[in-house]
């Protein structure tokens, strides 16, 4: 059914790609309480998702195939190496950087880089915020750190911190997802 719907949209409306939500849920493998979100490596799911991508690429070899997968890196690497783009959620890390909380690597956003993940191609669609997370500005205004008279809860300072975040975000190689509300 998914294949026929994708095919129809591609031929009828000239859609040039698809983004699938929560693809780690595209599985028939039962996941117990030790893995309630199904994030562990699942070879059967990989086969299914590759088949779906192949069906899309059979109709348009240049079509974009994007997954919000968010599973273990070993599984995402297989999909990325196959040519699939994958969501890269770095909301928490960019928020910690904007709020100036750096202890224990909380503000380390290097995971947005495909090389850090040991992927062969820049197939991380990195993002700082989406509809699933709280806005970074709100976090700065509510929980921003302070150092003497440098108060991140201050609007001017918070916006400068968010500008700095954007500079770091856009300089990392690879595609980006920019969410606007």
Model-inferred region functions:
Residues 1-41, 52-60:
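Substrate-binding/active-site clefts of carbohydrate-active enzymes
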Residues 26, 43, 72-74:
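Acidic-and-aromatic substrate-binding clefts and catalytic sites of carbohydrate-active enzymes
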Residues 14, 47-181:
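Conserved alpha/beta catalytic core and glycan-binding cleft of carbohydrate-active enzymes
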């Amino acid at each position: 059914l998914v294949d026929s719907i994708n095919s129809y949209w591609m031929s009828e409306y000239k859609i040039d790609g698809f983004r699938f939500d929560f693809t780690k849920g595209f599985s028939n493998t039962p996941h117990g309480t030790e893995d309630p979100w199904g994030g562990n490596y699942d070879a059967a799911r990989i086969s299914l998702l590759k088949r779906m991508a192949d069906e899309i690429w059979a109709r348009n070899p240049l079509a974009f195939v994007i997954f919000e997968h968010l599973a273990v890196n070993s599984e995402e690497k297989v999909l990325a190496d196959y040519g699939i783009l994958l969501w890269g959620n770095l909301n928490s890390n960019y928020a910690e950087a904007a709020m100036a909380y750096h202890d224990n690597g909380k503000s380390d956003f290097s995971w947005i880089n495909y090389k850090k993940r040991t992927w062969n191609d820049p197939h991380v669609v990195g993002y700082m915020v989406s509809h699933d997370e709280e806005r970074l500005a709100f976090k700065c205004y509510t929980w921003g750190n302070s150092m003497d008279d440098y108060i991140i809860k201050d609007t001017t300072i918070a916006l400068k911190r968010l500008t700095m975040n954007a500079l770091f975000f856009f300089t990392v190689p690879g595609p980006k997802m920019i969410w606007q509300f």
